[in-house]
Amino acid sequence: LDKTSSDNPKHIEVLLPYDAANESGSTADATFAQGVFKGIWSVLGPYFKDGKAVSPSGTLTSSSTESDWVSVAFDAAKSERVKSTLAGRLGMDKDTSRHTRIDGIISCNDYVAGYASEELNDLGYTGSAADINPSITISGIVDNITGKKDLKKQSVPDPAQAPESDDGDSDTEDTSDSLDEQNSQWPIITGYGAYVSSIPNIVNGKQWMTALENRKT
């Protein structure tokens, strides 16, 4: 993001799972969801403010604050809700012929990340994290795990300005197809929890990363 231009910003969505009512029907404690978004926004907020990051859905803007966590929160109790929420954010469905550009999806756990990946696949997005950084190799991953080297994922830098189509050009249709091909590229998808079920998606590049922490300390 530091190398991103406001003329060609990164398109990012935040998927924050939060059920406003618990199993007993009473209001759920929002402390955890608020804390998660506060951490996310402490990093992303400055980029949104400078126009280097935008939300395709408009749920987050340059004037958003950490108090706007509810705008990206949704009930993720059912898998179909995760998928429909993402499709709605992108303004797409399975019959949409053109793709909405999405560079990153901040999924706050591996459960959400998994179904976000499934929905992107259903919508026709293609590729994987390996396309974002082709320098990542199996041997490099093994060396990283064994402590022989540090492996850093770095994306190929975007041009300073987003490509524009010229309606007066005879090649407008070709340009449009080329732009849609770019827009349909697989985004970075983050997760959390190191769920066993998420490992295949990380191995095949559909999920960028996961994380875990020792809560006993």
Model-flagged regions — what are they?
Residues 1-217:
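A residue-level marker of the well-folded mature domains of exported/periplasmic proteins
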